[in-house]
């Protein structure tokens, strides 16, 4: 039987492990941490008897490979995810909210009832959307999202209340640095990917229960070897690579900086390419509203007006999604502020914007290297490292930014490539 050794049990590694098992490989999975999930995992800390996460993650309906993987390992996405049409409204009701209709009727109806936008604002978005579709959602590869907005003459209100929060949440990169090409690809799949593609899918459970735990259980049931809390040295990886053959391969499914360390002596050029990648941070500030009269937010997710001193873009009502009543999760994408400052700023921002006076900071999680800095013409590493050695992850060359769907797809695609090589 063919054997695949996978280093890393994040979403890419788990996806690859399941796909490889289905393809007839015997899988040995190693993970340095004691919990699976990588940068989308549960923490040891609890609130109201449920684990906190290392960040508040958001999926969309276009994440079809992730949803399919959930079903493969015995999960029901409709139970674990709260689905709602795209809703980027502030607490005061301003902003875009799409009804649950097919495109383009949902966009037209949503624009028609959007509060806070003038007719000129709405017309600028309709004109831009028509232009993007006419150009097949493609643009100059050197453009940033800011340049894209300038070229399509989007109004300031549309840029501030729609494009900027979408760019930050999807690419985790500031508009003036973010790749317009990748941004348009995300918009294309969300807007033209069929009914429900632009829906927001908010987890009702902790990230471990959302996918990683079920993947581990499924893999165990199907004969995989799983070793958590086991960090492989570069020497061990080199020895495994030296033993590679037509029936035995090694897959690095760890973060790019770790993959660079492990592959440095095997493929210096590939490792150097990984090491050169730039990353951006995401901060999640968990807040507890201790007001006994607090009945939750108006909606499970609210957009927040953001600035340098009020940096959070979204706040999630965990009590509306789970049993964690009174717990809020405020998210700061492309975060550049220190932990203590971000906690104070976000606490003040949520207090003022939502008129909540009894707020306590429960936990602030800053994932320093959460995603790639998704800049124009980014040179991302290939999945093929050298003979017998492969890699997968949300940083590997592909059309999408660093997302859960990108990680899942990367894991599945590398197994397809491996199978083609071994069968060839």
What are these regions (language model features)?
Residues 12, 35, 257:
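Conserved Rossmann-like nucleotide-cofactor binding loop
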Residues 2-29:
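N-terminal Rossmann-like FAD-binding beta1-loop-alpha1 element of flavoenzymes
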Residues 38-61, 129-133:
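Glycine-rich active-site loop/strand segments that organize a redox cofactor
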Residues 63-184:
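Mobile amphipathic helical/loop "lid" adjacent to a hydrophobic cofactor/ligand pocket
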Residues 23, 230-341, 352-353:
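Mid-domain catalytic core of redox enzymes
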Residues 185-239, 249:
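Helical element adjacent to the flavin cofactor pocket in flavoenzyme catalytic cores
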Residues 21-46:
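Glycine-rich FAD pyrophosphate-binding loop
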Residues 44, 101, 313-424:
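Conserved flavin/dinucleotide-binding core of flavoenzymes
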